[in-house]
UniProtKB/Swiss-Prot annotation:
Organism: Kluyveromyces lactis (strain ATCC 8585 / CBS 2359 / DSM 70799 / NBRC 1267 / NRRL Y-1140 / WM37) (Yeast)
Entry comment on modification after translation: Acetylated by ESA1 and/or GCN5 to form H2A.ZK3Ac, H2A.ZK8Ac, H2A.ZK10Ac and H2A.ZK14Ac once deposited into chromatin. Acetylation is required for function at telomeres. H2A.ZK14Ac is acetylated at the promoters of active genes.
GO cellular component: nucleosome; nucleus
Record PROSITE patterns: HISTONE_H2A
Gene3D superfamilies (UniProt xref): Histone, subunit A
CDD domains (UniProt xref): HFD_H2A
Name of the molecule in the record: Histone H2A.Z
Disordered: annotated span: 1-30
InterPro entries, per the entry: Histone-fold (IPR009072), Histone_H2A (IPR002119), Histone_H2A/H2B/H3 (IPR007125), Histone_H2A_C (IPR032454), Histone_H2A_CS (IPR032458)
UniProt keyword Secreted present: no
Function as written in the Swiss-Prot or TrEMBL entry: Variant histone H2A which can replace H2A in some nucleosomes. Nucleosomes wrap and compact DNA into chromatin, limiting DNA accessibility to the cellular machineries which require DNA as a template. Histones thereby play a central role in transcription regulation, DNA repair, DNA replication and chromosomal stability. DNA accessibility is regulated via a complex set of post-translational modifications of histones, also called histone code, and nucleosome remodeling.
Residue numbers bearing the N-acetylserine modification: 2
Length: 132
């Protein structure tokens, strides 16, 4: 074997390991949602002796963060259209049901969400123009 010893200062070039600041899994992945908590939930709810990889937790956390940002953006737009500054369950309902992909993904009933305004065309009065 060669005379090189594995290990050393690490990427930062610090002399002692005490000066390194520990980073969370979320910070390393560049996410806001907690990767460690998602991994813990995955391990707890995994069937039987199923093992959970760390990248699975990171990927799932990124998906959850993206979906949350998407719903909040659409709900914020709905609130802005109604000229209010607070997002309510009604705005969430309008945002989710207004987007086809989110509507098919989230089939849950939103409490205090109301219903979408819709009138069937058959119920509308027909205005016929008289031809001369």
């Amino acid at each position: 074997m060669s005379g090189k010893v594995h290990g050393g200062k690490g990427k930062s070039g610090a002399k002692d390991s005490g000066s390194l600041k520990s980073q969370s899994h979320s910070a390393r992945a560049g996410l806001q949602f907690p990767v460690g908590r998602v991994k813990r939930y995955l391990k707890r709810n995994a069937a039987g002796r199923t093992r959970v990889g760390s990248k699975a937790a990171i990927y799932l956390t990124a998906v959850l963060e993206y979906l949350t940002a998407e719903v909040l953006e659409l709900a914020g737009n709905a609130a802005k259209d109604l000229k209010v500054k607070r997002i309510t369950p009604r705005h969430l309902q309008l945002a989710i049901r207004g987007d086809d992909e989110l509507d098919s993904l989230i089939r849950a009933t939103i409490a205090s969400g109301g219903v979408l305004p819709h009138i069937n065309k058959a119920l509308l009065l027909k205005v016929e123009k008289k031809h001369k």
